[in-house]
């Protein structure tokens, strides 16, 4: 996490077919799904962009894995929407949701909500650090008992790192 925060973790940008990547992530996540939860990949338009494949996969896989942990039954949807200057990825679940008073803290290090995870509470902090290093932002909307939607917005044009 400290390498991410100091921008010393190198990003490797290459042209990437985002639709194909999403299908690969879908196949990988489908193997982790438990009975009673449906996984749906939103039908997205074709998109090729320059991005770091490994980091984008890490971010989306982490968000999807969290959705699985917190959705006992229902559905998990994910996909992306393109705008003129950016692409917004989303992971939506019909799980337990996040209490309103906890929303502002979930991207902090070592934060876990009651009965929320078996991890150490670094996943969302790492996601946020990577997204910011890639020139984007991450946010969440949630309602207890209804689920959550995580949004990751990344620029279509590779960000320039100032030295």
Give the residues covered by each predicted segment:
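Conserved catalytic submotifs in the C-terminal HATPase_c
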Residues: 12-17, 34-47
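Short beta-strand/loop element within the Bergerat-fold HATPase_c
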Residues: 75-85
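Short helix-loop "hinge" at the ATP-lid/N-box region of the Bergerat-fold HATPase_c
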Residues: 67-68
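Helix-loop junction within the histidine kinase core
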Residues: 2-13
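Short conserved segment of the HATPase_c
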Residues: 98-110, 150
């Amino acid at each position: 996490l400290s390498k991410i925060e100091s921008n010393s973790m190198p990003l490797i940008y290459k042209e990437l077919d985002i639709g194909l990547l999403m299908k690969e992530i879908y196949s990988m996540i489908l193997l982790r799904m438990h009975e009673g939860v449906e996984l749906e990949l939103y039908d997205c338009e074709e998109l090729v962009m320059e991005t770091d494949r490994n980091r984008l996969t890490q971010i989306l896989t982490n968000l999807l894995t969290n959705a699985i942990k917190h959705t006992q039954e229902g559905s998990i949807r994910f996909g992306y929407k393109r705008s003129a200057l950016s692409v917004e990825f989303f992971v939506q679940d019909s799980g337990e949701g996040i209490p309103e008073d906890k929303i502002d803290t979930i991207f902090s290090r070592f934060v876990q909500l009651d009965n929320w995870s078996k991890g150490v509470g670094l996943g969302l902090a790492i996601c946020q650090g990577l997204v910011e290093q890639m020139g984007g932002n991450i946010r969440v909307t949630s309602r207890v008992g209804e689920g959550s939607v995580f949004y990751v917005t990344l620029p279509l044009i590779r960000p320039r790192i100032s030295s």
